[in-house]
């Protein structure tokens, strides 16, 4: 095992960002550091603070098309510190990997974006169009005051993004083997099934909501929602939480609470899913309350300049072809896509994200910056 320093500019900036313990929704000066670098190469910096969330909109140029790097400075909590090989906010290089919370998700991407942009502007100071950065500290949290609020601000003044490249860790086994050219929609239900509480020895005086709901839940879990399509897998429904009872063995509960989530394709809409679930509840004659939370619409970036440029960049820098996919969770791309922007996600290998000993290969950081730079050249030269 070797511990070494590294002079790669992307690695050095990543280390500076990791050293700022920006657990969501904190930013801890990460955006200030980025803003200083961007201002030095001609970006107009516009901080946007909404309640406890720090956001930044930075732009170089006044004309279209607008290429936007999007990402987040916040990270998830470090968790059990005793399980980390190194302190999570003390960036450490071991055997060619940089360890620290946020190394892969997504401070490495942020550093690569900055360095790629600096190199591009140095070579092309009079580039056509505009380059922008949309950065938030509210991606890992409730995503209320982050990207969605910035987009609302931009939309209100008719400022449009043409292409957005989100730095989420899209890669699986090696850098660039997968890019995300879309995401499924996400819809969450919070269901309360009502009964009558009572003593288990006197069931005729009570009404057990667990017993009543069981056939519904069985049918819900076995329902086929759609077949998916060439871009999206079939819609998936997963029960995430069930809670009922007082903890005592002799009490029939009065209510049952169930939370379930849909990750849905473009073959259905949220409205169709809601209609089908509520029809199922009615068919089972349940007394219930239900609330729905829209977490994001599905989106897809098909063939076109952004996907072409990204494919070209990955092939040029890595020597292999990428695989566009729509699998996985949601990202802030879901807030950008409804504006009409084309959105892709390209970032490091995601094997250690949200885990103890999160790390990124330092050679991947430099390659990622080169990919980003080639994408800029393909779109704005």
Swiss-Prot record:
Pfam families: M20_dimer (PF07687), Peptidase_M20 (PF01546)
Residues forming the catalytic site: 74, 139 (proton acceptor)
PROSITE patterns recorded: ARGE_DAPE_CPG2_2
Cofactor note: Binds 2 Zn(2+) or Co(2+) ions per subunit.
Its job: Catalyzes the hydrolysis of N-succinyl-L,L-diaminopimelic acid (SDAP), forming succinate and LL-2,6-diaminopimelate (DAP), an intermediate involved in the bacterial biosynthesis of lysine and meso-diaminopimelic acid, an essential component of bacterial cell walls.
Residues that coordinate or bind Zn(2+) 1: 72, 105, 168
Gene Ontology terms: biological process: diaminopimelate biosynthetic process; L-arginine biosynthetic process; lysine biosynthetic process via diaminopimelate
This protein's record includes keyword Hydrolase: yes
Amino-acid biosynthesis listed as a keyword: yes
Record's catalysed reaction(s): N-succinyl-(2S,6S)-2,6-diaminopimelate + H2O = (2S,6S)-2,6-diaminopimelate + succinate
Broadest EC class assigned to this enzyme: hydrolase
UniProt-listed Enzyme Commission number(s): 3.5.1.18
Organism, scientific name: Shewanella sp. (strain MR-7)
Similarity comment text for this entry: Belongs to the peptidase M20A family. DapE subfamily.
Keyword list, A-Z: Amino-acid biosynthesis, Cobalt, Diaminopimelate biosynthesis, Hydrolase, Lysine biosynthesis, Metal-binding, Zinc
Co-factor requirement: Zn(2+); Co(2+)
Subunit text: Homodimer.
Biological or metabolic pathway of the protein: Amino-acid biosynthesis; L-lysine biosynthesis via DAP pathway; LL-2,6-diaminopimelate from (S)-tetrahydrodipicolinate (succinylase route): step 3/3
Alphabetized InterPro entries for the sequence: ArgE/DapE_CS (IPR001261), Bact_exopeptidase_dim_dom (IPR036264), DapE_proteobac (IPR005941), Peptidase_M20 (IPR002933), Peptidase_M20_dimer (IPR011650), Peptidase_M20A (IPR050072)
One Gene Ontology molecular-function label: zinc ion binding
Binding of Zn(2+) 2, residues: 105, 140, 354
Full protein name: Succinyl-diaminopimelate desuccinylase
Domain of life: Bacteria
